[in-house]
Amino acid sequence: MNLELVVQLGSLLLITVAGPLIVFFLFIRQGNL
């Protein structure tokens, strides 16, 4: 398996998962519960 491909897929998965979580976290921190 190509290491670069694994890194790209890992980064894409991380962004896909972390993006909404970061937005949600910032939304909560502003007191909009």
From Swiss-Prot:
InterPro entries per the UniProt record, alphabetical: PSII_Ycf12_core-subunit
Keywords: Chloroplast, Membrane, Photosynthesis, Photosystem II, Plastid, Thylakoid, Transmembrane, Transmembrane helix
Assigned GO CC terms: chloroplast thylakoid membrane; photosystem II
Subcellular location field: Plastid, Chloroplast thylakoid membrane
Keyword Protein transport: no
UniProt GO BP: photosynthesis
Principal localisation: plastid
Entry superkingdom: Eukaryota
Family classification: Belongs to the Psb30/Ycf12 family.
Record's function text: A core subunit of photosystem II (PSII), probably helps stabilize the reaction center.
Record's subunit section: PSII is composed of 1 copy each of membrane proteins PsbA, PsbB, PsbC, PsbD, PsbE, PsbF, PsbH, PsbI, PsbJ, PsbK, PsbL, PsbM, PsbT, PsbY, PsbZ, Psb30/Ycf12, peripheral proteins of the oxygen-evolving complex and a large number of cofactors. It forms dimeric complexes.
Protein name, entry field: Photosystem II reaction center protein Psb30
UniProt organism field: Euglena anabaena (Euglenaria anabaena)
